[in-house]
Amino acid sequence: MTKIFRYILLSFVLMMLVACGKPDSQKAFEKGFKETMTDINKKMNEGDNEATKMMAKILEKATYKVNKVAENGNVSELDVTIKAVELTKYLSEFMLSLKPLIESNMREEAFTKATVDYFSELSKKDLEYTETNVKVHMEKIEGEWKVINTDDILVGIFGGLEEFVRAPHN
């Protein structure tokens, strides 16, 4: 009797493992999110601009949670919540802190020092976060899942800073 019970239990556990796997589109999204975060970090750490490097440290705090996946053939929609530092608030504060320097015709060195000082202090603070709910649209192209609306994900990563993401890049 115990052998039969073990086989039934083992079969049940095996079926649960197979049934509880993540959909392929979710796996592709998770892999792509990690790659995007790595690319952003890598690009922002190039060169010797300390303020940009500090900003990269702030951005790498972004996380995500996949709430729901609706996969239908070659299309998929993921309901994702991206939690990131609320950059809109902090960049507004930064611009206000620069106002006296701008009015006094600051030099580039003063701007650089003020920027580094601000982001250095910011990295020591307990930062506020914002959550952005994103409907991620994916399509299976040549056997691989691809995100269609990448800008929406970037807005979430940049803490709702839509102007930065959607601005024309030269």
Task: Say what each PLM segment does.
Residues 21-23:
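Bacterial signal peptide processing site
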Residues 131-166:
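Short beta-strand edge/turn micro-motifs at domain boundaries
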Residues 1-8:
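Bacterial N-terminal signal peptides that target proteins for export
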Residues 16-19:
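C-terminal motif of bacterial Sec signal peptides marking the signal peptidase cleavage site
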Residues 26-56, 109, 165-166:
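N-terminal, intrinsically disordered, polar/charged segments of Gram-positive cell-envelope systems
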Residues 86-130, 168:
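Mixed-charge, low-complexity intrinsically disordered segments
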Residues 82-88, 140-142:
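Beta-strand elements of well-folded, non-transmembrane domains
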